[in-house]
């Protein structure tokens, strides 16, 4: 008969064996697990290094492509606007770099910028519709001129008025706007808070216009995109060509470029470019203006939704 002591010793031996098994087993599995994790970690680091190298290589290629565009851009646009002039309108979200780049490339194309006129936040938000309408319909309209009766919203009417004042009408029968009348229109809109510009001795008329806007607009931007699109479209009949240019994201609603492309009437009036923040887009601005001034068709260019091609076909 097994004594109590022997029974206790047997149980102790069993528990000891179990404990040793657990310890040895856990050590084995933990070593295996750690070894596997170390291997996976090395593989991940290898993948990260490879992806980093690929990213750096792509960045170098993009940089080289941008530098190439910058170097050859002036040759591509050479004499495209020789003897022609352009007035630039900018929205509150337009970038200074884009304005400077457009002004520069107009000069490289042989053209001249007559003025850069800024539309204020009050203008694009359209919260002062009656105030703007009263200014537009006041006695500042140049003698012999008439606003289009088809345009009823204040943004379009303001575009029509500024088109009369600042653009050379392609119709030789159109009345000539004197400098004093032009100054009156600009001063009235500036004093009422709708535009700003750097006063010069003389802001002459231009053959064409570029309206420069920003990129994507937030969904709570209200009617800003619509206001800018209608303004740009209203300028078109008064000169030899109007182009609306925006940055990456401008081809998405509710931005002005997207609004223009989605509206058949506006899309038939003005050209658009949706990548003015890149050198190819700036080159396209000049090529598109050249087409418009010389009687070509409107076009919609860039890489965003609604673009018909990346640039103007030759």
From Swiss-Prot:
InterPro entries hit by this protein: MctB
One GO CC annotation: pore complex
Recorded GO MF terms: porin activity
Keywords (A to Z) from UniProt: Cell outer membrane, Copper, Ion transport, Membrane, Porin, Signal, Transmembrane, Transport
GO process annotations (BP): copper ion homeostasis; monoatomic ion transport
Tagged with keyword DNA-binding: no
Signal peptide per UniProt: 1-30
Subcellular location: Cell outer membrane
Chaperone among keywords: no
Phenotype reported upon loss of the gene: Mutants show a severe growth defect in the presence of copper. Deletion causes a drastic virulence defect in guinea pigs, mostly due to a much lower bacterial burden in the lungs.
Annotated function: Pore-forming protein, which is involved in efflux of copper across the outer membrane. Essential for copper resistance and maintenance of a low intracellular copper concentration. Required for virulence.
Family of this protein: Belongs to the MctB (TC 1.B.50) family.
Protein name: Copper transporter MctB
Lineage of source species: Bacteria, Bacillati, Actinomycetota, Actinomycetes, Mycobacteriales
């Amino acid at each position: 008969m097994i004594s109590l002591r022997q029974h206790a010793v047997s149980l102790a031996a069993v528990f000891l064996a179990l404990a040793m098994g657990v310890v040895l087993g856990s050590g084995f599995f933990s070593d295996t697990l750690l070894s596997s994790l170390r291997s996976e970690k090395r593989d991940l680091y290898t993948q990260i290094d490879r992806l980093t190298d690929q990213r750096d290589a792509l960045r170098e290629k993009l940089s080289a492509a941008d530098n190439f565009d910058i170097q050859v851009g002036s040759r591509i646009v050479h004499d495209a606007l020789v003897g022609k002039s352009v007035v630039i309108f900018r929205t509150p979200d337009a970038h200074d770099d884009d304005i400077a780049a457009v002004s520069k490339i107009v000069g490289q194309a042989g053209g001249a910028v007559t003025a850069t006129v800024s539309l204020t936040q009050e203008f694009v938000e359209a919260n002062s519709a009656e105030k703007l309408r009263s200014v537009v319909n006041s006695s500042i309209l140049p003698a012999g001129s008439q606003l289009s009766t088809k345009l009823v919203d204040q943004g379009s009417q303001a575009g029509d008025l500024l088109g009369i004042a600042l653009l050379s009408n392609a119709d030789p029968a159109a009345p000539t706007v004197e400098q004093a009348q032009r100054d009156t229109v600009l001063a009235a809109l500036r004093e009422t808070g709708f535009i700003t510009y750097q006063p010069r001795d003389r802001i002459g008329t231009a053959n064409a216009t570029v309206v420069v806007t920003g990129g994507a607009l937030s969904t709570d931007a209200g009617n800003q995109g619509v206001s800018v699109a209608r303004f740009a479209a209203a300028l078109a009949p008064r000169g030899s060509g109007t182009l609306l240019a925006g940055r990456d994201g401008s081809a998405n609603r509710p931005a002005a470029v997207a609004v223009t492309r989605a509206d058949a009437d506006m899309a038939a009036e003005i050209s658009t470019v949706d990548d003015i923040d890149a050198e190819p887009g700036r080159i396209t601005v000049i090529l598109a203006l050249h087409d418009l001034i010389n009687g070509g068709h409107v076009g919609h260019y860039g890489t965003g939704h609604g673009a018909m091609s990346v640039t103007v076909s030759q």
